[in-house]
Regions:
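A detector for small-residue-rich transmembrane helices and their helix-helix packing motifs
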Residues: 3-243
Length: 243
């Protein structure tokens, strides 16, 4: 979730040396699943974000995405969230400040989304994305409750946090490149003015915690799903406590 474009690093999806047998089997199953169905959730999320931006323009927003009916009713802004407009915690993740902001975020999602969707499965991947977006909104409100914040990068940072956590558990979704991906984007987060640092950090933490639940409770999928949903509930509660 950001005021400007986030940094991009195309992860290397090639196999890394030194994997354990379990990650190799997981990778093979994931590739088989992808060949049958494809990462349609990732593609759908990209399509929704693009469609929402076009609707912003059609409802009076300027080319940089500001103004208009959809932007006014969807942007994350602490004082109106405090008045009960809690849906902004989620809707703001589908709004963007102009074509460049949208394009950069969607390009990152295009690069990193399919690998995680392969590993987690479509439903759990979508839950991870939503929970990460909510955690990003909470982080944004903690750091800057009176700022107007929009963008998918809180959710995208959650995907990066999930990849980093999985890599720490020797599950190499990005061929061992998750740490480099996160560090590269952290540099952009702190160097480029106007980026929502809280949104990025919140998403990163939320995604990592969600991935921890998914990987630790993989033999208990129902409990894992409930645990990740609880991360989303806590994120909403934390966000509302800041306004």
């Amino acid at each position: 979730m950001a005021f400007g474009p986030v940094g991009i690093r195309c992860p290397d999806h090639a196999s890394a040396t030194g994997r354990t047998a379990a990650p190799r089997r997981t990778a093979r199953r994931a590739k088989a699943s992808l060949s049958r169905q494809g990462p349609f959730v990732t593609f759908a999320l990209i399509g929704i974000n693009v469609a929402v931006f076009l609707l912003e323009l059609a409802t009076g927003a300027t080319i940089n995405g500001q103004g208009g009916t959809i932007w006014r009713n969807g942007v994350l802004y602490g004082p109106v969230v405090a008045d009960g407009e809690w849906w902004r915690l989620l809707t703001s993740a589908f709004l963007h400040y102009g074509p460049l902001h949208l394009g950069m975020n969607m390009l990152v999602l295009w690069f990193i989304g399919p690998a995680l969707e392969d590993y987690l499965g479509h439903a759990r991947y979508l839950l991870l994305y939503i929970v990460s977006g909510l955690a990003g909104a909470a982080g944004a409100l903690i750091f800057h409750p009176n700022a107007f914040t929009v963008g998918a990068s809180g959710a995208i940072w959650g995907l990066m946090g999930a990849a980093l956590l999985l890599e720490a558990r020797r599950i190499y979704v990005f061929g061992g490149q998750a740490m480099g991906l996160v560090v590269f984007n952290l540099i952009f987060t702190f160097l480029i003015p106007g980026i929502s640092i809280g949104g990025h950090i919140g998403g990163l933490i939320g995604g990592a915690v969600a991935a921890l639940a998914f990987s630790s409770l993989r033999r208990k999928p129902a409990l894992a799903t409930l645990s990740v949903a609880a991360v989303g509930v806590v994120s909403v509660a934390l966000a509302l406590s800041q306004v």
